[in-house]
UniProtKB/Swiss-Prot annotation:
It comes from the Eukaryota. The keyword Manganese does not apply. This is Large ribosomal subunit protein eL18. One of its GO terms (molecular function) is RNA binding.
C-alpha cells in the first residue's frame, strides 16, 4: 500500500496584497498588478513585488546615492524609481538635476531636488509616462544596514566571527577578555 505524499510544506509564501491598510498603496498595488499582467514587463512585476514588501525590506535611500547614480554616463535623462523613502544627506554638497519617482520623499530632500531644477513624480504618474519602464533606473536602500543585522552571522566568540554579541553593558568585564585580547589566550 502506498503512502500519501505530505503536502504540508507546499505553500508558496508570497504576498498578494500590501500588509498596510493605506488605501493609496493598495490602489497602486492594483494598478501595477494590472500593468504587470497586461504588459508582461519585468519592470512592472518588480514594482508590484516591492509595493507589497514589508517596510523592513524597503529601506530608506539616501539622496547621495541617487545623485551618484544620476551622474553616471547615460543616466542623466532617466527617471530614478524607488519604492522606499528618499532621505536628505547633509554630506552631499551639490544636488544634480534629478527626475525621481518614489513612494515618499522627506521635506529636506524634496526641497533640494526641486531647488536643483529636478522633479518628483508619483508612481501612478510614472505608470502613465512609462508603462513599460522605459528610460528608468531602479534603486533600493541597503537592507543589511540595520543595527540588528550586526548580530546575525557565526556566533560571537568563534574564530573569524565579527558578529556583535548581545551584552548587558559595554564595560571591561563584558565579553572583552578571552578571544578579544592576545593576552587572554588568543585574539580573533
Amino acid at each position: 500500500m502506498g503512502i500519501d505524499i505530505s503536502h504540508k510544506h507546499d505553500r508558496v509564501a508570497r504576498r498578494t496584497a500590501p500588509k498596510s491598510e493605506n488605501p493609496y498603496l493598495r490602489l497602486l498595488s492594483k494598478l501595477y498588478a494590472f500593468l504587470a499582467r497586461r504588459t508582461g514587463e519585468k519592470f512592472n512585476a518588480i514594482v508590484l513585488k516591492r509595493l507589497r514588501m514589508s517596510r523592513r525590506n524597503r529601506q530608506p535611500l539616501s539622496l547621495a546615492k541617487v545623485a551618484r547614480v544620476v551622474k553616471q554616463a547615460g543616466n542623466e535623462k532617466k527617471t530614478v524609481v524607488t519604492l522606499s523613502t528618499v532621505t536628505d544627506d547633509a554630506r552631499l554638497y551639490e544636488v544634480p538635476k534629478i527626475s525621481l519617482a518614489a513612494l515618499h520623499v522627506t521635506e529636506g530632500a524634496r526641497a533640494r531636488i526641486l531647488a536643483a531644477g529636478g522633479e518628483i513624480i508619483t508612481l501612478d504618474q510614472l505608470a502613465l509616462r512609462s508603462p513599460k519602464g522605459e528610460n528608468t533606473v531602479f534603486l533600493q536602500g541597503p537592507r543589511s544596514a540595520r543595527e540588528a543585522e550586526k548580530h546575525f552571522g557565526p556566533a560571537p566568540g568563534v574564530p573569524h566571527s565579527h558578529t556583535k554579541p548581545h551584552v548587558r553593558s559595554k564595560g571591561r568585564k563584558f565579553e572583552r577578555a578571552r578571544g578579544r585580547r592576545a593576552s587572554r589566550a588568543y585574539k580573533n
